[in-house]
A protein has these predicted regions:
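An N-terminal assembly and electron-transfer interface module characteristic of large anaerobic redox
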Residues: 1-179
Length: 179
């Protein structure tokens, strides 16, 4: 049997993390460890020279089975209090997807506790990084690109330029020079 589709090299969670990396927010992947460790060790070259607030929730089997959503909410709120991000983004992996974790409610509760804009990007760790990045960028546009905001003269947004597509670290600076 021949494969008709070649699987993509990075998951939707990597797309979210890559899209939001430089925006000053805190991104939390709700997972035991697998999704974020692959992203951190293979997909993201910016770790070498730039800090970011991308974390894993360290979901345990017991928390997943027993539905200990409060621990996730408390941990994210506590970290946000210590780190002072501009916003909070949460995304998911296979285990919380299988147990039916309610990301919308968790995001609302985290926002209520922290006072920070909090949103979730609908991921489950099994789709393409393109879907994750798209979801992240759409959330940012809906929440932060408002009518009536003053436009910066002679400026342009370079949306979607992440190392997942532009792997050479100088690619984005080359795009900026060209513009």
């Amino acid at each position: 049997m021949n494969a008709k589709v070649i699987s993509i090299y990075a998951a939707d969670t990597s797309g979210v993390c890559s899209a939001l990396y430089e925006l000053g927010g805190m991104t939390v992947v709700h997972d035991a460890s697998g999704c974020n460790s692959t992203y951190a060790t293979h997909d993201e070259p910016r770790w070498y020279d730039r800090k970011s607030m991308i974390y894993i929730s360290a979901l345990t089997e017991a928390d997943a089975v027993m539905g200990n959503d409060g621990k996730f909410i408390r941990d994210v709120a506590k970290a946000a209090g210590e780190l002072s991000p501009k916003f909070i983004a949460i995304c998911g992996s296979p285990m919380p997807a299988m147990t039916g974790f309610d990301y919308s409610s968790a995001a609302e509760e985290i926002e209520r506790e922290t006072g920070l804009t909090t949103f979730f990007v609908d991921t489950n760790g099994t789709h393409s990084y393109l879907q994750g990045a798209e979801g992240a960028f759409l959330n940012i546009a809906k929440l932060f690109c408002c009518e009536g905001k003053e436009k910066q003269a002679n400026s342009v947004n370079i949306i979607g330029a992440t190392p997942l597509d532009f792997s050479v670290n100088t690619s984005v600076s080359s795009i900026k020079k060209w513009l």
